[in-house]
Amino acid sequence: MSKIRIGYRLARLGLVVSTGTILTVLFQRGTLPPKGIQSRVTRWWHRNIAKSLGVPVRIYGTPNREATLFVSNHISSFDIPALGSVLPARFLSKIEIKSWPLMGWLATRAGTLYIERGGRQASASANRVMAEALSLKHNVVLFAEGTVTDGNVKRFHSRLLQSAVDAGAWVQPVAIRYPDPDGGLVHPAALFIDDASLKQLAARMLAARQMEVEIYFGEAISAAGSSRDELARYTETEVRKLLDINEPDTKRSS
């Protein structure tokens, strides 16, 4: 890609960050109801980050309109602005993000929920805050694999789906794909390889050609009467179907 086009994208990204920071100071309060000025500002943020990086977001299927736990596979940090551009939703992220300069503050003001590193106690705490958000009719996005992948779907962990059971919320599977024009599983610019920094990821995406993200929404179901394991199994199976990826012959972990 030409240096002129990369420079244009970079300048536009800088303008989006500057404008978005001002809007965040004025309007964001650390929660994200599905309607209202906070939701509009956050979606503006995500939509314009995608545009400034030159990455179209293609939507297939329909997001559920009621308070929903959206359960997705996870490939890239760009999954967040991609989903956030079409969903008024709060994301669950690792606690380390909260301390990042500027980005951590912006994420917190946008209503991000955090999970501590650890076992059952950390999961129980995350379940409580997620269930509270769902009970307030806020949407929540969960990347159920617990890590970024190379495009091959890993097992969906079930522990944090307890939040939907506790809140009596809806659960909807979401599949994310970054088509590779050269025939690979994922466009290489989207991959979060070897603990790459956000700056490195953004640099690759700024220079990428023919890059887009596809988001597929599966059928939403009520969590009422289901166990967290059943919900994990359902969402993982549906995501695999949406991406046409076969299930490996390994045991589930929770």
Regions found by a protein language model. Give the residues of each.
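Soluble, non-transmembrane catalytic domains of enzymes that act on hydrophobic metabolites at membranes
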Residues: 47, 52-60, 78-80, 156-166, ...
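Catalytic core of membrane glycerolipid acyltransferases/transacylases, capturing the structured
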Residues: 20-32, 36, 50-52, 66-120
